[in-house]
Design a protein with these regions (language model features):
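Active-site-adjacent substrate-binding region
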Residues: 2-82, 88-100
Length: 100
């Protein structure tokens, strides 16, 4: 699974990135950080939903030949992204979201 740090439209909240990295480390999930100089996701829209902003992050699946007819992913990466998402949602209420 990839943990988004930034793309062309957003910089993810450092607390969300740290939270997902912490979960992945505890559960021994393979992850990599995603930094995209071009392209984007709906993460920016979610961050801007509230006047004061929102804590937002994103999980993605490493892909080869994206947007091509030969696009490929590894099954373990798909499973890892699902597991990271599930664990992140299940333990969201336990994390200290205050500024450090």
């Amino acid at each position: 699974a990839c943990i988004k740090v930034m793309d062309s439209s957003t910089v993810c909240d450092y607390r969300m990135v740290a939270y997902m990295k912490e979960i992945a480390k505890k559960k021994k999930l393979k992850t990599q950080l995603e930094i995209l100089p071009a392209g984007g996701t709906d993460t920016a829209g979610i961050q801007r939903m509230n006047p004061g902003g929102s804590i937002a992050g994103a999980i993605s699946i490493p892909t080869r030949h994206i947007h091509q007819v030969i696009e490929m992913v590894h099954k373990e990466d798909v499973r890892g992204a699902i597991d990271l998402l599930r664990l992140s949602v299940e333990t969201l209420h336990n994390y200290d979201w205050s500024f450090r």
